[in-house]
Amino acid sequence: MIPWHCEQLNFISSLANNRPEFLDPLFLFLNYFDSPYFVMALVPFVWVGFSWRWGLRLFYLIAASVVVNTFFKELVGWPRPCADCPSVGMLCLKSFGFPSGGAQTCMLLGGLLIYTWKTRWAWIVGVSYIALISFSRLYLGVHYPIDVLGGWVLGLGLLWLYVRTIGPIEQFLHRQRLEACLGLSFVLPIALMLATTSPHYFRVDAVAIGIGAYLSLKWGLYLADNRDVRKGVVRGVLAVGLMWVGLVVVRGHLPTPWVYGVLALWLSLGVSPLVRKIVCS
């Protein structure tokens, strides 16, 4: 065991021994926010419900976060509490513990929400999301406090990088031909992801989402941006439902990476036109 994990393991053990059973289902549910299924719900909800541009930004931002997180996990190689002491973990994952991917993602997305909207409700939702997901990693016994802290630091770093670069990047892409943007959507994500053992489904997704966005723009399949919250929620919920229908249809028939690739194409080439037809009919 790593020396500075000893004291933290005492804290995790104490937390595990005093977990109220009625809270267990809540924190097990919160683990969903650190899974591909969360991305599969969030991106379509935003893409179809409100803005395909924001949906695309979120996808690439989360994909970049996964790559960075995987790189540091492999570089540092620290174990999880449940690996050091199996009795403390309600769950136990096989990957390394530092930094926490869940804490990193919630800091990135919660911070992005606060930065973008700058309202009281954005602060309430963003801070609550960060606090709940971060504490859930400790409650479930899958991370040490230092893992969560490391995730926060990386999440804030990625948010800072996004804020500083998104404008120039999108201005550059706007000046390029659509086909050039398609090529970049192939080369850059795959090059980054090949540098680590990041999940294979993100490599396939990155290519599929680029193809889908290209064809969607070329054929005019995307929905116009929407600022009506009620209308956006209806469109978003329909999109998530159609994505789950797609998952049920293809799961079991294809390898997992290809399942997510098909779903990425389904989002831009199938879900958006279907939702437009349903909402406008």
Where are these regions (language model features)?
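Membrane-embedded catalytic cores of phosphoryl/pyrophosphoryl-handling enzymes
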Residues: 27, 42-43, 56, 66, ...
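First transmembrane helix
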Residues: 37-46
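N-terminal transmembrane-helix/juxtamembrane module of multi-pass inner/ER membrane proteins
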Residues: 1-38, 69-95, 223-242, 251-281
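Charged, low-complexity surface patches
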Residues: 19, 61, 201
